[in-house]
């Protein structure tokens, strides 16, 4: 089975956003705006936490997949590329977690 990466998912979201069409859930989410996409992401985050607290491995994996999808849709809605998030993560790897947290603007 070929490996499906988060970059593959981002490319799929980009393609569906560009193609549009009534059958595209991605397009429907984006058409409702970034605020709606943020709400959906929040709902999925809560469902992911619940699955983790319940210690339900299969449910956590499924909700984690939903969470990643909705995060990427939210990024798309706000015009942010996955590579920008990766760059932010990359900057953090050069310092400890405590140093990174202290460097953030409140």
Swiss-Prot record:
Pfam families tied to this protein: PRA-PH
Any one GO biological process: L-histidine biosynthetic process
Its EC number(s): 3.6.1.31
Pathway(s) the chain acts in: Amino-acid biosynthesis; L-histidine biosynthesis; L-histidine from 5-phospho-alpha-D-ribose 1-diphosphate: step 2/9
Keywords for the protein's UniProt record, in alphabetical order: Amino-acid biosynthesis, ATP-binding, Cytoplasm, Histidine biosynthesis, Hydrolase, Nucleotide-binding
Localization of this protein: Cytoplasm
Keyword Coiled coil tagged: no
Molecular function terms, GO-annotated: ATP binding; phosphoribosyl-ATP diphosphatase activity
Catalytic function, reaction form: 1-(5-phospho-beta-D-ribosyl)-ATP + H2O = 1-(5-phospho-beta-D-ribosyl)-5'-AMP + diphosphate + H(+)
GO CC terms, sorted: cytoplasm
Protein name: Phosphoribosyl-ATP pyrophosphatase 1
């Amino acid at each position: 089975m070929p490996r499906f990466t988060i970059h593959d998912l981002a490319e799929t979201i980009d393609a569906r956003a560009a193609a549009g069409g009534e059958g595209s859930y991605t397009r429907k989410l984006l058409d409702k705006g970034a605020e709606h996409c943020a709400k959906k992401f929040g709902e999925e985050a809560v469902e992911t936490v619940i699955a983790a607290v319940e210690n339900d491995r299969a449910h956590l994996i499924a909700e984690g997949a939903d969470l990643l999808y909705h995060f990427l849709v939210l990024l798309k809605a706000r015009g942010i590329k996955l590579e920008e998030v990766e760059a932010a993560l990359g900057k953090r790897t050069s310092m400890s977690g405590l140093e990174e947290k202290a460097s953030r603007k409140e």
